[in-house]
Each structure stands twice: as C-alpha cells, then as structure tokens.
Amino acid sequence: MQSADSATQAALASGERTATHTTRLGGKDVTAQVESWQVERSYATDLPAAMRAFSGSSAAQLQLQLAGTGGDSAPELYSAWADHATGDLARPGQSVVHETGVGGGSTLAAFRGTLRNRSAASGSDTVQLTALDGAERLRAPAELPRPYTGLYWGRPLASATWCVDELLRQAGLLTSPPPRAPQFVAGQPLTLVHATLHGGFATPYGMPEDLPDPRHYTWSRTGAPHEMALVPRGLPGGETGITASWFPRSRVTVPGSRLLAEAWVNNAVGIGSTVRIDLELNRTGAAIGTISLALDFTQGTVLATSLSSDPQVPGGALQWGFNATAMQTQRGIWHFGAYVDVYASTNNQALPSVIPLLTAPDGSTWVGEPAVFTAASGPQPVAELRKVRLVTSMATEGVQVTSGLTALPTVAEFSQAGTWIKTAELDEAILPLRTIPKISGSQWDAIGQIAKASMSTAEIDERGRFRWRNFTRFATAPTAPDLTLTSVRNIAALTVTEEIDACRNFCVQPAKDWGAVRATAGDIVSDTVVREIPANGSLTMSYVFGEEELDVGPPDTDDDSVVTTGSSFRVATQNAAGTKAVKGAVDALVRREDGTIVLRLTNRTATKLYTVDQSGGPSIRIVPIRPDRDPVERQGVSYVPGSDSERFYGRQEFYGEQSEWVQDLGAAQQLAQAMRVAWEYPVPVLEDVQVLYDPRIQLGDVVRILDTTGATLDTLAWVVGISTSASAGGGVQQTLSLRGVRANGVPADAGLTPDAPALSPAPDTSATYAAVAAAYPTLAALLTANPTWGDVKDGAPA
C-alpha cells in the first residue's frame, strides 16, 4: 500500500470519502476543469481469473472528461484542430499526472503516463481524454543481444530477468547507473563495455567472452550496490576470485586511448576481500599486455600493474595505501575505478598513467596521485584492447569501460549523480539462458511474453515506477493483511466465484533443452574489395547476416605473425601485395543492425591505410557463429498421484506453452511445480467488490475480507484489479477484484454421497441359451421358423 499522511489516515478512519484530486496535463494544473475521472488497472493474462495474480502484465488507463475555461469551450481549446497554443496540452503523447486523496490530506499518486487519444464533441463543452501509463514508454522495437558465448562454454550467460532489465534500460527505465556514452559520436567518448550483472553477463555494449562455472556464483539482490549483483560462492582451484570477461564493442588502440574502467562492489557480501579489473591488450604475434587495477580490502591497498607475456618487455607495479584505514574498516558499497591514459606514443609504445578513484560507503571519494609507468617498468607496445576481465571475490555490479575521455572525470562525473533516476525494480533472477531468444514486437510486448513464460507479473505503479515480480513472490501465502475491509464498514457489495477451471493438479511445462548445443562457425563472409581508410578518418561497411546467426565481437587485427581463425582484418600503408602489416593503428567497432553486421574501422594515424592482405587481396573476413544443432524438447511435470485434489476434482491438466525462454529441464520442473502448488485447488475469486474509497490500495496488496452479512467469510486475498471513478462533485466509487491467497481447504463432502458420473449398465434382456433351446428344440424347428438374429437374441419366436 501507499503510505499516507496523518490527515489522510484520520479521514479514512472517520469514514470520510469525499475525493480530492490534482490533475496536470503537460505540467499544467487543470484540476478545476476535470468534470469526471476514472482509473483502471489490473493484471492482463489469458489464464483463468483465479490464476492471473501469478502471471501477466498490467497497463493502467485513465479517462478524463475535461471542460473549457475562460469562456472558451473545451472543443475550442483542446480538439485536434485547436490552436497549438492551447491544443498541445491535450495532444496524444502529452504527459499526464493524476493524484487523488480524501478529506484534507495530501493527495497520493494515482496515475502517471501519457495521453493516448482525445475526442471532442462539437457543440458541447467537454473533451474526452484517454491516457495509458508508463507502458507507453516501452513501445519502441524490442532488441536484445544474442551472443554465442553461452553455447561456446555450455553455461548460462543471461536470464529472463536480465532481458527484462535490458528492455527497460532501452526505454529509460533504469535500475542502476546507465552507460556513460552509449551512442557513437565521432570524437566523443564511447562505452566499450557496460555489464550490469543483473542476472547475466550479457551486455548490449561489448560481448561476454569468459563465463564462470555457475556452481561458483549466484545472483542476489541482497546487498547489491543498486539492484542485483554477481556474488561468488565458491572459488575455482588456485584462483582468488571468479572470472568473467568481455570483448569491447570497439577494439581501441594503444597508444591512442584514454580509458575509464570501473565497477561497484559490496565488500560485506561474498567470500573474500579482493577485486580486480584487467584491460587485456592484443599485441604483435601472440604477446599479450595487461593493465590492471586491484583492490584488497583486508590489506587496505590499491595496486596498479602493467604487465606483458613477452619476457623482453619489463612489467611494473605501483601501489597506493592512502586510504588503507577506510578500506579495512568500512563495510558496504564501494565504487572504484581507474583512469588509464595510454594516449601518447613514446618510441612506438605507451607508458601508462593510472589514477585510481574510490568512493567509500560513507560517501567519501579519494582520487589517487597519478602513477606513471616507465620504459624500464611497465611499457605497453602498440596493441588493441582485446578483452576486459573481472576477477572478484565479493558482490559486484556495473562493470563499465569507457574510451575517448579527454581528462580525469570529476568526483561528480565519476558518481554519475544527478544523471539518472532509479525507476524500476526487479526480482531475483530466474530462467537461466544459454542463448537469448529472438524477439519481435515492442519492448512491452517482449516483457509481456517473458512474464507469461516465467509466471511473473510486470506492472508500472501509480508513480510511474516499474515492478517485476517472479512467481516466487506467491510461493508462501501471506499471514497478515495490508488492510482489513469489513461488510459492516467498508464493503457495499461483493461476488464470490469458484470455478473448476482454476484447478490444475497435473501441470506440464515444455522446455527446449540447450544442454548439448554448442557454437560452431558458419560460412565465412569475406570482403570483395580492398578499401581505403582515410588518415584520421573512419570507414563503415555492412555485411548480410542470417537470423539464425549469433552476434560476434569486433575482428582482430592481423599482423602476419600468427594464424587468426576468427573474424579479422589486416591493414597496410599501400594497396599492394607484400606490404608490411600495420598494428595498433585502427579501432574496430562492430554492431548488429537490421539483418546486417556493421563494421566501422577508424584510422588513428595521419597516413592512409588499406584493408589488404599479404597477397594483395581484400583482408576483411567475418566468421559467423551459429548453434550446431537444434535444442531437444523436454517436459517438466508436477503431479501427485492419488492426491486429494484429484480425488475431489478429477485430474485437471495444465499444459504450459512451448517457450524459447525455458531452456533447461530444471527450470521447466520448477515452473510446473509452482503451477501445481498454486492451482492444486480452485481458489475463489472475489469480484465486483465495491468498497469505500481508499487511495492507498495498490495491485498486489493483501487485504482481509471480513463479511458477516452475506457470504460469511473471513479470508486474505490479493488485489488483482482496481477500478476507481469520480465525478466533479467529489463522489467516488472504488471496485476491487481479488484473488484469495489460498483455497478453502480440502472438501469434506460430509453427509454427502456423490452420484456416480455414469449410470450402471442396463439389465441384459437378451435370451439365454436355455430359452433359445426351448423355443427351437431342433434344427428343423429353427429352419422352419426362419427367425432373424434379432428374434433369436431377443427371445421372441417368429
């Protein structure tokens, strides 16, 4: 329930039900012009009414009747052809905020959304307006990344919950800080990796590469810095933390880059006290460079390293201990990052400068002194950023790497405070995914499909905040109500309904099991021409990709020293065979767009470069990845033979829809079990419950219904539908739809002897053998009578 001030609570306690309201259109107060209003919200689903609290999406609707003002009629002011100076207030898409209350208390949020349509009857003084809630913000085309990584490792890479979070983020409904620079703008910063870790390693910016064993971690909202975190619960042998990594969406060059790597952690949750972010660099040949920032909260140290797999390149390490006491004593949420400057080139190599940033649980932020590596200790020869790696032993959320920064971010810029508002809330992660299903329709359509497949509810509340609830929310029946409604005081009418369609004691959930499916290379897409990349400029190409093919990362830069089996390209200073390959000069960015793979190559040098291979031909090659087989169809079944439910109601089957979102038998079994537990007995529905208006009631609230005058019941029920309407005079009517939290126990049928479902067989009146023998003692008698078979069978002589 919504919280109310003392004046509202006093008015409700005294029985005051004269409604007050405040209505704004486009930010302008039009309260005095509202003649009537109605707000409706409920869970929408194709399940029987008694089941709908467990699955579906809610989209609220507001209807307003608006009068004119200042001597001008409403149609004159607000019709579709009205002057924009007044008509835009009621145009489709305009913002609407509606608040309601009772007595003299403060108004409470009742609706927040946008106008859907307007209708003005000429000659009248009213305009009818219809608005829908924040679900209208989710009408853009739904898009989700489809990385191959889960099939490559045979491990989950995301979950249905992560997909919901990503669809919300696309619409601006955020659960954690957004990517710093999501859009590509030439010369501006660019987000290379943004992994929320909200139930998955997938990301729309970058691509997961290394996935940890699911036995070693869990997803948890408890103690998460913002919404949900990756929490280690076991370590692989010899490791200090669990490891996950991502390819950046653009392979930026070193030298030539300034990077900000960051993450949020909770050092009070997990199994250790260390966390590290690595920037792995792909150098000439098989050599690998690594720039790292590591935190140890037990030691109170921050350590930066610049290392190389090539023994000819010396490594180095630099340490800060300026905030050791705080690191050792403060337990809670930390935000840490490293500003890495590898822009300048000195003798064809970068000398990294690293500045750490840490924000403690108490809000204090420390910015370390720059640590600069030297040619003798920690240089990084020319390379491209190949991988971002996280190694953590504590709860971690929001790994992000941004390139193109021109300077160290300020403390305010680092925190991203004031740049976003948390407007969504998730539930625990469910339905692990090895591959993300193809989706279509709007973001709201996709969220509704996921809600249906996972027995979850999706709703946008009165304040415009999104709430996602799993079926686990209803696993334990509540024992205490949020509000008590009685027939003596609050209830004017109610109807109690019970139907056998709400009983399901044999539940089946199909699954498409991806356990044996792996990733395999598809047909290589090779460029047909050698292309020129302008000096300090960019080149963009697109290649057709099939729907069944999964996302790929940016291609590697071929330097002629190793064989590259995946996607790659080679550049040289001349369009000719035998020209030496150039390394560390081109940023490569890849994205999927409308059935194509778009590749952008950016030249970081003042010399023209050409995409030419050693033989003089085109060098760009993209290797698609696809599943090597179809998933196996399986079924999760939940059934208790001979149960009381089956004895009294018969076997009632519910067969869940085949869904791409259920990808293993364990998840299917869990869903089937939840269905049977929830629906084993038909739960009553209380419909048309007319109550004294209470603006605090919300969907999902638990109310106690105490009826001593009619149905004689005392039960708890979930609110699954609310309809509230009011006229200009302040009269208000509120009608609830409720679903009982449990059935009324097991039937007893005391004193009853239920009739059999069918009558016993009718007596057999056919003639016996003795009767036939008596009627026809001899064969001659039978032949003489010449009876039909019916005559003989019925015992009637001819």
Regions found by a protein language model. Give the residues of each.
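Acidic, low-complexity/disordered segments
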Residues: M1-A10, S122, T126-L151, T298, ...
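Assembly/oligomerization scaffold segments
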Residues: M1-T406, R434-S440, W444-M455, V488-A493, ...
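Surface-exposed fibrous attachment elements
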Residues: S6-R17, P179-P212, T253, S442, ...
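Surface-exposed, non-catalytic interaction/assembly patches
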Residues: V34, Q38-E40, L138-R155, R434-G448, ...
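Short, conserved helix/loop micro-motifs enriched in His/Cys and acidic residues
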Residues: Q183, Q416-P437
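Short, well-structured active-site flanking segments
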Residues: I460-G464
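Stable alpha-helical structural segments in soluble proteins, enriched in small hydrophobic residues
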Residues: G666-E680
